[in-house]
């Protein structure tokens, strides 16, 4: 018969979940704000959620396109808007996750824990959907060898969100065993 696990393991698991959430937030801030949503940023090609610049052979410069030209190139306005909504909405929902996580840990509140899991699950779906939709429209200009740091940061954030959801699905069973509410903080 196995005895109860030491409290430090539960606290270490919780702290690792909080650290992963903070890393996901930092990766998404880097990709979407610092890199301005650019997934490919090369001297002859810049493609992102707000930039669509292709190399012009005639003038030998980078020419940025706006919406009437983008629709002619095959990038629909509604599709790009939905991709932006998904990716940037994912960042917003991820920003709301740490508070319910902390409240759930301090108060042993399973509803707050489920709320945080919900925020992260919807965030993961929005990020995957927005990134997938965007890539489906720009795939003819972007190749696997061309992704920039913004794309790698968003891909890493998506992988970490999935890892977080798996870890959080296992964690609530351990969180309920706290001896008292005051000791769990």
Swiss-Prot record:
Extracellular face of the membrane: 33-77, 136-150
Taxonomic superkingdom: Eukaryota
Tissues where the protein occurs: Expression significantly higher in gliomas than in normal brain tissues.
List of glycosylated residues: 38
Leader sequence residues: none
Pfam family, one: TM140
Alphabetized InterPro entries for the sequence: TM140
Ranges of the Cytoplasmic topological domain: 1-11, 99-114, 172-185
Protein name, as recorded: Transmembrane protein 140
């Amino acid at each position: 018969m196995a005895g109860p696990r030491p409290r430090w393991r539960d606290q270490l698991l919780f702290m690792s979940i909080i650290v992963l959430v903070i890393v996901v937030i930092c990766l998404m801030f880097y990709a979407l704000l610092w890199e301005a949503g650019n997934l490919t940023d090369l001297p002859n090609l810049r493609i992102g959620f707000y930039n669509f610049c292709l190399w012009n052979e005639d003038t030998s410069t980078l020419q940025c396109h706006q919406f009437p030209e983008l629709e002619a190139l095959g990038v629909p306005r509604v599709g790009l808007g939905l991709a932006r909504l998904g990716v940037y909405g994912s960042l917003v929902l991820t920003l709301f996750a740490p508070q319910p996580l902390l409240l759930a840990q301090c108060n042993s509140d399973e509803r707050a824990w489920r709320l945080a899991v919900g925020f992260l699950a919807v965030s993961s779906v929005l990020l995957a959907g927005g990134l997938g939709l965007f890539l489906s429209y720009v795939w003819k200009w972007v190749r696997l060898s061309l992704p920039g740091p913004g794309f790698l940061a968003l891909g890493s954030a998506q992988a970490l969100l999935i890892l977080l959801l798996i870890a959080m699905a296992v964690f609530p069973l351990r969180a309920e065993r706290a001896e008292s509410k005051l000791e769990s903080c």
